[in-house]
Amino acid sequence: MSEETTMARGRVHKDPRSPAEFRAMREILGISGPGLARMLDVNPRTQRAWDYKWIAPDRAWEVIDGRIEWICRTVDALLAEMDGADTDEEAVYVVYPNDEAAARAGIGVPASWYLAALGIVVLMARREGRIVRLEYPPKE
């Protein structure tokens, strides 16, 4: 595809990250392909092409990069909370089974994104020898 064609389709992105990296980041962040396609108002086939063969456009990378920044802030904040606690003390974090439950709890992102962030917190905390669990809220 020529640069002119690429520019006409709005797919110019000078970032060196590949479709494989785009897919890996999207999946580890808990962002579904169909969900991203809806969010960006593109055909799901277009989004799948970003995972396998086309360089994703700036606006798709902005979603990915925004989630990465949010997760890093969330991970840093939660790990900082643990710093003052005894290493043997168990930390329990609540995650939500769906977007509706997350919204009711005041979580400002989809449940899958929040779950991905807390999953990373668990990995990082356990790496430091902490005891961490994730739980769903009790049924009402």
Q: Can you describe what each PLM-predicted range is?
A:
Residues S2-I28:
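A short, Lys/Arg-rich alpha-helix, primarily the initiator
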Residues F22, L36-A37, Q47-W50:
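Conserved hydrophobic/aromatic packing and binding residues within compact polymer-binding modules
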Residues G30-G35:
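Short, charged amphipathic recognition helices of the HTH superfamily
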Residues D41, D58-V75:
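DNA major-groove recognition helix of helix-turn-helix/homeodomain DNA-binding modules
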Residues V42-A56:
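Recognition helix of helix-turn-helix/homeodomain-like DNA-binding domains
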Residues R73-E140:
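Helix-turn-helix/homeodomain-like alpha-helical modules used for DNA recognition
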